């Protein structure tokens, strides 16, 4: 995946040296702001990923024409009015008015306002950095196979409309590239980021429903643009894997802390006491709460607790006030040292983000089925850590 303008030439040089033809996609930042935390929002312009769809300072509201296509004449219909051929060296704006370049003579009195807005949006995209890099990749087509574009907008996104907006913008880029270079991008990868429920108050994205909505939107946009629909790819890693993982912790200490009268829980209710439940893990095996403010829940796993509950905060063993695993959860009032706490939905970005912070050992991973359990990844040992040290 190409992430910046200088990469195509470097990849082309390597491919030529190896006698290969590399398959590449361009990662495009669509300008869609999505994702619950700044660190996992990846489609706005001021971050490290991808190449911007629009020029700096462009009026992104012009892309809103994609939200109301009723006033846009379907390409390839009887309203195809422009018959002139574009010539090499013409501006992108002028080329968009011709034949495959753009199916309308925009000066014709029968052209709707929607048609004009669509031509304006395409012109703006044609002047953007993303199209320039697509052209650069296409220029090396002898050693680079341009597979398509990639648009990952963020992580743990609850609003499926954000994916639809990003998809529409990629369809417009695809149409514009066809208009300027007569090349049809075969694939659009919309990445991942589909939400999962980490706590009782959250919902997982209904992929069946939302992907059906997205498919309808993509079909409609391409029909109006006169383009064949591309292959649409997705990367639902978190949505697939996160619910399969549960992390088990052993309780070390249980410490009630009296709070001032101004303290409140996350629902806004006043609280006078919070119980700090310290366990034998923490930010070394799950950094997400400290890094992103991610929320989890917990349950006692080794026995049935009392019906009475207390407001608790599950914290880790590291010397950090921010070493919090579950910020707020009601646990049985009789929780005690030695209990096992289960924290669900840790199958994604738990073990893979684990570290040896403070020389902590990374725990084992055990696969469990109805009939069997076996160790998939063994527990790290002190000897494992020492193996990295050079004694000479």
Region locations from a protein language model:
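Active-site-proximal beta-alpha core segment in soluble small-molecule metabolic enzymes
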Residues: 1-82, 88-187, 196, 217, ...
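Electropositive phosphate-/nucleotide-binding environments in soluble metabolic enzymes
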Residues: 2-5, 53, 124-128, 164, ...
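Anionic group-transfer/hydrolysis microenvironments
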Residues: 5, 29-31, 152, 191, ...
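Conserved, mostly hydrophobic/aromatic
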Residues: 11, 26, 149, 190, ...
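Flexible glycine/acidic-rich beta-alpha junction loops that bind and position SAM and/or redox cofactors
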Residues: 32-36, 154, 186-202, 232-244
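Short glycine/threonine-rich loop-to-helix capping motif typified by GTGT followed
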Residues: 157-166, 197-210, 241-253, 326-331
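Glycine-rich and small/hydrophobic secondary-structure elements
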Residues: 205-222
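Charged (often Lys/Glu-rich) extended helix/loop segments that serve as interaction or gating elements
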Residues: 219, 223-392
């Amino acid at each position: 995946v190409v992430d910046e303008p200088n990469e195509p030439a470097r990849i082309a040089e390597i491919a030529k040296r190896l006698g290969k033809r590399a398959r590449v996609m361009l990662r495009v930042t669509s300008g869609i702001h999505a994702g619950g935390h700044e660190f996992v929002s990846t489609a706005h312009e001021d971050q490290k990923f991808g190449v911007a769809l629009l020029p700096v300072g462009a009026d992104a509201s012009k892309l809103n024409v994609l939200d109301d296509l009723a006033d846009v004449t379907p390409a390839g219909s009887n309203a195809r009015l422009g018959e002139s051929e574009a010539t090499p060296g013409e501006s992108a704006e002028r080329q968009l008015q011709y034949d495959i370049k753009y199916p309308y003579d925009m000066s014709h009195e029968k052209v709707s306002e929607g048609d004009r807005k669509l031509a304006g949006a395409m012109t703006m995209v044609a002047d953007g950095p993303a199209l320039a890099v697509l052209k650069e990749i296409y220029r090396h087509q002898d050693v680079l196979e341009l597979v398509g574009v990639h648009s990952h907008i963020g992580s743990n996104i609850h609003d499926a409309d954000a994916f639809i907006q990003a998809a529409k913008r990629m369809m417009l880029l695809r149409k514009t590239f066809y208009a300027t270079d007569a090349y049809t991008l075969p694939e659009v990868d919309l990445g991942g980021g589909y939400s999962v429920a980490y706590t009782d108050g959250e919902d997982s994205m209904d992929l069946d429903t939302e992907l059906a909505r997205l498919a309808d939107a993509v079909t409609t946009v391409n029909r109006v643009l006169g383009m064949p629909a591309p292959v649409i790819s997705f990367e639902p890693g978190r949505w697939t894997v996160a619910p399969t993982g549960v992390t088990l912790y052993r309780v070390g200490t249980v410490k009630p802390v009296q709070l001032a009268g101004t303290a409140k829980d996350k629902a806004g209710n006043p609280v006078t006491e919070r119980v700090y439940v310290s366990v034998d893990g923490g930010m070394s095996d799950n950094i997400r709460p400290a890094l992103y403010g991610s929320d989890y829940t917990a349950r006692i796993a080794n026995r049935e607790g009392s019906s009475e509950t207390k407001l608790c905060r599950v914290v880790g063993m590291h010397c950090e006030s921010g070493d919090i695993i579950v910020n707020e959860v009601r646990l049985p009032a009789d929780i005690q040292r030695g209990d096992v706490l289960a924290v669900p939905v840790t199958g994604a970005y738990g073990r893979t983000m684990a570290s040896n912070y403070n020389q902590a050992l990374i725990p084992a991973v055990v696969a469990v089925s109805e009939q069997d359990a076996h160790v998939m990844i063994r527990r790290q040992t002190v000897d494992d850590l020492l193996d990295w040290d050079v004694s000479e």
